[in-house]
């Protein structure tokens, strides 16, 4: 489904603003970027097949791997608009998909791997049912 740019950016801003304060306060020197699709270089770096979809990408040095030196260039979290729109049938689903993608990429910033992120996703999902 096609959503307008303002609506998408509103949901993205909401998702970034909803990062819990104990994590948001530790997000330093991170740029959130909105692109239509992953670049050929990003797809190649991740060894993505042509039919694979990517909603977001964290590029940088995860917080636990840093040695205390100051970085001049920011880490980057890129959110990919077209794949998220294609996977969303309603505005509510788009909002949820953007929120989950932002949370997922922020988790990578904090050094979490996909296994741990999946475990936390299950906990978050179960908690939201309570």
Annotate the PLM regions.
Residues 1-67, 72, 83-86, 91:
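A metal-dependent hydrolase signature that marks the N-terminal structural subdomain at the beginning
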Residues 51-99, 109-130:
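Active-site scaffold of zinc-dependent metalloenzymes
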Residues 102:
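Walker B beta-strand of ABC/ABC-like P-loop ATPase nucleotide-binding domains
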Residues 105:
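Walker B catalytic acidic pair
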């Amino acid at each position: 489904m096609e959503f307008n740019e303002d609506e998408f950016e509103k949901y993205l801003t909401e998702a970034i603003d909803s990062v819990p304060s104990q994590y948001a306060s530790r997000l330093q020197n991170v740029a959130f970027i909105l692109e239509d699709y992953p670049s050929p270089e990003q797809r190649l770096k991740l060894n993505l097949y042509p039919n694979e979809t990517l909603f977001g990408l964290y590029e940088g040095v995860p917080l636990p791997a840093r040695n205390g030196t100051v970085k001049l260039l920011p880490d980057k979290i890129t959110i990919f608009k077209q794949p998220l729109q294609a996977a969303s049938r309603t505005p509510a689903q788009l909002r949820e998909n953007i929120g989950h993608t932002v949370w997922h990429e922020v988790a990578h910033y904090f050094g979490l791997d996909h296994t741990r992120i999946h475990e936390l996703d299950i906990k978050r999902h179960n908690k939201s049912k309570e």
